[in-house]
């Protein structure tokens, strides 16, 4: 981002989820992080489901900070495995695999999701805009 902006290239940037890491602003400089967008998995400002806000509040109470999108994904992953075990009534590898493959309308903190035939989660996402590295504007996009 810094090199691009130093070269006078001031077009919007659409990047991967990692571009939202606070280190990006530290490395690129705050002034170079405006007009940058990325798809995020979770936002406390744009809760995807009714379980997102209680999760975020409990996390902040326990750890003194907001959960990151990666924390939210990890939380959902564990809950999805739990749901698969419960749905298949087994802890075997094959049963968990089958349970995950058949997961439908799972209400996670990152969104309501179903697993498609190719084993990909189909769920909402958050479009996030970085503004001077410190602020963000989040919009929940449901699929």
Task: Describe the predicted segments one by one.
Residues 1-143:
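Extracytosolic ligand-binding ectodomains
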């Amino acid at each position: 981002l810094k090199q691009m902006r130093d070269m006078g290239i001031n077009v919007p940037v659409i990047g991967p989820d990692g571009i939202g890491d606070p280190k990006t602003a530290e490395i690129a400089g705050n002034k170079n992080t405006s007009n940058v967008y990325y798809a995020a998995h979770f936002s406390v400002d744009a809760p995807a489901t009714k379980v997102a806000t209680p999760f975020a509040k409990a996390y902040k109470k326990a750890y003194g900070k907001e959960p990151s999108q990666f924390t939210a994904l990890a939380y959902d992953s564990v809950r999805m495995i739990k749901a698969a075990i419960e749905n298949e009534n087994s802890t075997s590898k094959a049963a968990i695999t089958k349970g995950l493959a058949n997961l439908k309308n799972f209400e996670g903190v990152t969104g309501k999701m179903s697993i498609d035939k190719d084993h990909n989660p189909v769920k909402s996402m958050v479009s996030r805009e970085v503004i001077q590295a410190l602020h963000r504007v989040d919009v929940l996009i449901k699929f």
